[in-house]
Amino acid sequence: VVEKAELGGVCLNWGCIPTKALLKSAQVYNYLKHAADYGVSLEGTATADLPAMVTRSRGVAEGMSKGIQFLLKKNKIDHLAGFGKVKPGKKVEVTDASGAVTEFEASHIIIATGARSRELPNLKQDGKKIIGYREAMTLPVKPKSMVVVGSGAIGSEFAHFYNSIGVQVTLVEFLPNIVPIEDEEVSKQLERSFKKAGMKIMTSSSVESVEMAGDTCKVSIKTPKSVEVVECDIVLSAVDIATNLEGIGLEETGIKKKKG
């Protein structure tokens, strides 16, 4: 197994697993806010500690990554830390952190290089005010407000998480329904739930531009009726993902991409 970063890949380290850990923290916080509804009395008021939630989420991911490392060792599977590149003749070139290159040969090669946040031309990520999903998992301070662009699985999960811990969230979707690949009745029900929780939903809308005014993001959003400017602390771009296929030797070996 050739891996340049953490074992377990994107899903385990920067996707499904740590996201679900954050959502669990939000769920527990919500339970505590409504403890009396369950016949539970609390002294004081529950507060959402985002840094502590992030620490727990990262700990869950790191623990599972170490579990992958243990399983590889237990099953006598070699782990090569470095960047892999496919070469003609069923060979793989691995460059480690020091720059040393080692070549391996195999009868079968599996390419599973994961994905990253896709950037829109008019929504360039700076990692601080306009962010992708990785930064959304590790924000050091809870923002007061956030615009989430894209309502697929990634956008909807983060919108729900941040809304649940007290952030004013606006969810922007280009298509007529949020979570557009789901059945329409599912989309409508989720939209009702989000609105009931205090989230602002803008469908059939697109972000035209983001301008900075000090620490405030001024997001120009084109709606079916006009252009609306929404001010927020953070813009999360969650429109799509891009595959990590650059520089791994596909062109040199004649391997064609499909939907990549």
Role assignments for model-derived ranges:
Residues 155-156:
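N-terminal Rossmann-fold NAD(P) dinucleotide-binding loop
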Residues 55, 111-112, 148, 237-238, ...:
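Redox-cofactor binding/interface segments in oxidoreductases and associated redox assembly factors
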Residues 159-164:
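Gly/Ala-rich phosphate-binding loop of Rossmann-like dinucleotide-binding domains
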Residues 127-142, 234-260:
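FAD-site-proximal beta/loop scaffold in flavoenzymes
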Residues 4-142, 170, 175-179, 185-186, ...:
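Glycine-rich flavin
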Residues 98-108, 225-234, 245:
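Core beta-strand elements of the Rossmann-like FAD/NAD(P) dinucleotide-binding domain
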Residues 4-5, 149-152:
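Glycine-rich Rossmann-fold phosphate-binding loop(s) that bind the pyrophosphate
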Residues 1, 147-148, 171:
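Hydrophobic Val/Ile/Leu positions in short beta-strands of Rossmann-like dinucleotide-binding domains
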